[in-house]
Amino acid sequence: MTSSTFSAPIENRYFEDYKAGSVHEFGELTVTQDEIIAFAKEFDPQLFHTDPEAAKETIYGGLIASGWHTSGMMMRLYSDHYLSKNASLGSPGVDALRWLKPVRAGDRLSIRVTISETRRSTSKPDRGLVHSFIEVLNQDRQVVMSMKAVNFLLCRQNL
């Protein structure tokens, strides 16, 4: 699988720039123990996310990031590198969210986005829908999380 490039920079990207079948790889974000613990204490206070010593005695054998934290890190990379800065209109939701492998302190995460389908809206012709399959990869290229997403984007042709 080879990575594609967009025909337009993120600041000038519209629906027409998202091509079905293209694959895009972005980012690198390093996970830290402090971030894992801080997120978990606030939003997912389970011992294997908040207490490095107690986490050693769990099935994970050590501290792991909350899946919701991993999802948030994915969104940061997705927003910074993939979503249009001027034409993104949000998303009606995601499907098939899966946390496949634990994410640990020191892991370096990137994302791979495969555009599976694009179509112009029939009810609102100023926009289109982009269906994507998103994978979060660690430094060993193992998929640690995946999901399907749909995004609404403005069309360039209507400007």
Task: Enumerate the language-model features and the residues they cover.
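Short beta-strand or tight-loop elements
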Residues: 92-95, 111
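HotDog/MaoC-like acyl-thioester-processing domains
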Residues: 1-20, 99-159
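Hot-dog-fold acyl-thioester-processing enzymes
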Residues: 2-93, 158-159
